[in-house]
Amino acid sequence: MFLSDFDYELPPELIAQHPASRRDASRLLTLDRLSGAIGEATVASIAAQFLPGDLLVLNDTRVIPARLHGHKESGGAVEIFLVRRVAGEPECWSCLIKASKSPKNGCRVVFPGGVTATVLERDGGDWRVLFEGSDDFMAWLEQTGSMPLPPYIKRAPEGEDLERYQTVFAREKGAVAAPTAGLHFTPAILDEIRGRGVEIVSVTLHVGLGTFMPIRVEDLSEHTMHRELYRIPQETAAAIRRTKERGGRVVALGTTSLRALEHAAASGEVAAGEREADIFILPGYRFRVVDALITNFHLPKSTLFMLVCAFAGKEAMLEAYREAVSRRFRFFSYGDAMFIG
């Protein structure tokens, strides 16, 4: 398969630069995987898409203010962008570093509050960095860092982003990008879904900067997928087993939830625990866990667009995207949503 197979035309004015007036005010495009039928609804009415006995799986990651500004001990300015936490080491991160000169192993960066960062080594295309000097690193980060926004949002972060670029169920700090399908959901919508006889559980996948990185090869067999840290609780794995046994659907809220579940089921059944997902889902992939997907619209030629093409069929998905463009749906992180069932 080739990168050019997953391209589509998108007028730039359809890329949402701000969130909708309310979380549940977005539009919803529906796609039936079996018939290819396309419909339209609203996020406010999304509970109607669920059936009694379904299981909804959320990603409860919380976006952190991942952009930090400090200086070398010699005085030069340094910007560090946290990409992902190193598994098992809460204050060691893979980072992007912007400075006048490329950093060297052992270089120390000083930040407000007495925190220092030591550059340890290269970690693929990133740097592995150890932060020291804070009793509560995440609390310090909340005070010191700035909120990241996706590169296709062509404006500076504003006050509304602190609330709206975060899901209402965000809990586990560690993402540098939001699981955007969840941005539409309100407590009232979740209550309405529960009222239809649907169980709701969570996973944690800390969305990394790699979600925005373009694929740089035409032959997709040559692409190396980025890694993201995730955790499946025991109760979530058990709920999935119960749902499958009774014939219910597992509905993933967002591609991040889907990637965590499918990676955790590599041996057949979803296994609880903490791992790193590097799963690259292309058409032809056999889905083991997820039966329905709620997702936003994804960038052309992106790994996430390839994922939804694998889930619904490439031609059906391309047709759905053409329909979304013709109906002037809003695209990407602050855009509208899809329910693929």
Swiss-Prot record:
Protein EC: 2.4.99.17
Q: Which GO terms describe its biological process?
A: queuosine biosynthetic process; tRNA wobble guanine modification
Entry keyword annotation includes Ribonucleoprotein = no
Q: Which residues cross the membrane?
A: none
Pathway(s) of this molecule: tRNA modification; tRNA-queuosine biosynthesis
* Source superkingdom: Bacteria
What protein is this chain from?
Answer: S-adenosylmethionine:tRNA ribosyltransferase-isomerase
Provenance organism: Citrifermentans bemidjiense (strain ATCC BAA-1014 / DSM 16622 / JCM 12645 / Bem)
What is the phylogenetic placement of the source species in the record?
Bacteria, Pseudomonadati, Thermodesulfobacteriota, Desulfuromonadia, Geobacterales
